[in-house]
Amino acid sequence: MVFSSLPIEEIRGELMEALRVPSPRILLKAPTGSGKSTGVPPMMDDAGLGDRGLIVVVQPRRMAARLLARHVARLRGVELGKEVGYAVRFERYISSRTRIAYVTDGMLERWLTEWPSLEGVSAVVFDEFHERSLSGDLSLGRVLDLQEGPRRDLAVVVMSATLEISGLREYMGGSCRVLEAQGRQYPVEVVYRAPRLVSDGRGRVAPPPIWEQAADVVREAVREDDCGDVLVFMPGVYEIRKTVELLAGKPWMSGRDVFPLYGSLAPEQQNCAVERGDIPRVIVSTNVAETSLTIEGVRTVVDSGLVRRSGWDPYRGMDTLHLVKISKASAAQRAGRAGRVAP
């Protein structure tokens, strides 16, 4: 399969050159939708790293690892688990023939514990590193230490869409090569929709639940002939289920499929949401569709502006999920999903 249609192809020559030096360290900055997750690992395989060992691509989410492996295997025309595979908790599609493996940061951390020298691994690629995690940060430090010690043949690549790279470049050392690729982005019109206010029956007014607000905007969007597939961002599984249930019962949704998309969903259902069919779709997703995955056919994005994020709760003495507003950078990333195929 030829990946020449991906914007990331513009840095192929630079990447090949950077991989030829001893103990290569590469920091790659490329926007969401540039094809770095699906394009860079095959380029590294073309450079001969797959002949020397496994190219490990670290993802922050299980769903991303699973779907990316399936997508790359399909693009290369190979069976999943043979040349291209993945390993996440409770699932392992890797064989002795595997050259590219998509794994979670937790899985890499486990491998580093079981095989401290990462025998049989030729390269480690940290994808979506801007989605920082303790496990990912620790694993990067251990891999860099390993490269400075017994594994000087190991290639280390860190890829990010939005991260400020100056500090990371300094941490990775003076030998780190910085590459930057451009994305392919059509103009996107951003419209803020203030929620309608409804009475609570006691003389007070308040916005309706966010799934009702989202349904109002989706109804307006699908009236347009050129709205394409619609991607709705919700903060969590509960809100996604309520939104899907509400949309599925609307008569104006006739002729459109509606799919949920989140990490704990069954793999078969995730595939249905991501793979494009003949019927227009409305996909209701968590922030996994913000950077980790590119869903083809999306021309309209409905953003709740919220996310559930893990954080320390001093009253409970444990990590819990907090409902918070997204950052300006995240809002731009979500809006940009509407500009991948057309204005």
Predicted regions and their residues:
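P-loop NTPase motor module signature
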Residues: M1-P343
